[in-house]
Amino acid sequence: MIPNLAALLALPIGEITVLAVICLIAGLIRGFSGFALSAMVMASGVLIITPVQLIPICWWLEMTASLFMLRDGWQDANRKVAIGLAIGSTLGVPFGLALTMAIAPDLSKLVALGVIIALATLQLSRLKIPFLTTNWGLYGSGWLAGIVTGLASVGGMVVALYVLAQQAPPRQMRASLVLFLFLGSVTTMISLWSFGVMDETAVMRGLVMSFPAGLGVVMGKLLFVPKWEHLYKPFCLTLLIALASTGVIRLLLSA
């Protein structure tokens, strides 16, 4: 069975095991924070397979996590914000995928992660960004998230910056992220198929890795309790910076 799994996923068993552990940890983070699953997988998984191959796998992981968390997301989310972000993201993903095909993958990811570090640092410094409270800020953030999703599958990090900038309860912020990622996953699938990124191997890898990711999500949800809600925003912003910085360092070292 193990050799068959290796052949099915076109990966050695050792790499499959490492990738499964990465997905478990990423799912744990997603279950608590409501985002960062794809970012965690991209930041670590690129040591095993290329970003272009990881993007469709991340789609399956995000969809699995969304199904586990959607009920709470629908009940507690700011639906206007989540839907607006999803609309913008839908328009942005094709641009990002086109850029991915046109420029070097490492360069595209370096640009995306650099933007994340800058914006997250600004928010940790408590600098107000009035633009994010406008309709243009809403749809613009969604569009940028779509582009970054196509570039490096870290669009959820951009949306997290927008949602965390709102003066809303932690539970609502987390739920809005969950709802956006579900809606965004539905529309992103169309672009992935259109660009030929979602092939049979990607589907099988995504389905297999959904099991450890789903287990991680369940464990992470158990950690999101009221007494820790005040830690939510600083934890998420610090997580954004850490993940993005890790990706940048890896890219620079491999250059």
Where in this protein do the model-derived segments appear?
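Membrane helix-loop-helix hairpins that form the core translocation module of multi-pass transporters
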Residues: 51-125
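Hydrophobic alpha-helical transmembrane segments in multi-pass integral membrane proteins
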Residues: 54, 105, 109, 148-155, ...
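Residues within membrane-spanning alpha-helices of integral membrane proteins
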Residues: 16, 59, 112-116, 120, ...
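Transmembrane helix exit motif
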Residues: 2-4, 66-76, 97, 111-136, ...
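Small-residue-rich hydrophobic segments that form or flank transmembrane alpha-helices
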Residues: 2, 15-83, 142, 146, ...
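Cytoplasmic-side transmembrane-helix entry/capping segments in multi-pass membrane proteins
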Residues: 78-89, 109-113, 133-143, 172-179, ...
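Small-residue-rich segments of transmembrane alpha-helices in multi-pass membrane proteins
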Residues: 43-52, 86-97, 119, 139-151, ...
